[in-house]
Amino acid sequence: MLKPLGDRVVIELVQAEEKTASGIVLPDTAKEKPQEGKVVAVGTGRVLENGERVALEVAAGDLIIFSKYAGTEVKYEGTDYLILRESDILAVIG
């Protein structure tokens, strides 16, 4: 399993829609980059200037919305993940 460091979070992407509302099938090049994902692992938190560690506000299992071009895409054991900083997370869904 991937274990992120510091204030980083590993998410599994929620796949973009394959069809439009009217039923048109979209090719991969026309799909919007996903901005939703499920948190699968979180780092230990960020360290403040005084050395204190601050825990992350998200937890494994949270469904999140993140910045469109944030993070680094990685493939691990056949699954696509995105590793991003907590500051790139815009909201938790639900």
Curated annotation (Swiss-Prot):
Superkingdom, natural source: Bacteria
Keywords: Chaperone, Cytoplasm
GO biological process per UniProt: chaperone cofactor-dependent protein refolding
Main localization category: cytoplasm
Stretch forming the signal peptide: none
Subcellular location(s) per record: Cytoplasm
Gene Ontology MF terms in the entry: ATP binding; metal ion binding; protein folding chaperone; protein-folding chaperone binding; unfolded protein binding
InterPro entries: Chaperonin_GroES, Chaperonin_GroES_sf, Chaprnonin_Cpn10_CS, GroES-like_sf
Pfam families according to UniProt: Cpn10
One GO CC term, this protein: cytoplasm
RNA-binding in keyword set: no
UniProt family annotation: Belongs to the GroES chaperonin family.
Function summary: Together with the chaperonin GroEL, plays an essential role in assisting protein folding. The GroEL-GroES system forms a nano-cage that allows encapsulation of the non-native substrate proteins and provides a physical environment optimized to promote and accelerate protein folding. GroES binds to the apical surface of the GroEL ring, thereby capping the opening of the GroEL channel.
Subunit: Heptamer of 7 subunits arranged in a ring. Interacts with the chaperonin GroEL.
Protein name: Co-chaperonin GroES
Source organism (scientific name): Bacillus cereus (strain ATCC 14579 / DSM 31 / CCUG 7414 / JCM 2152 / NBRC 15305 / NCIMB 9373 / NCTC 2599 / NRRL B-3711)
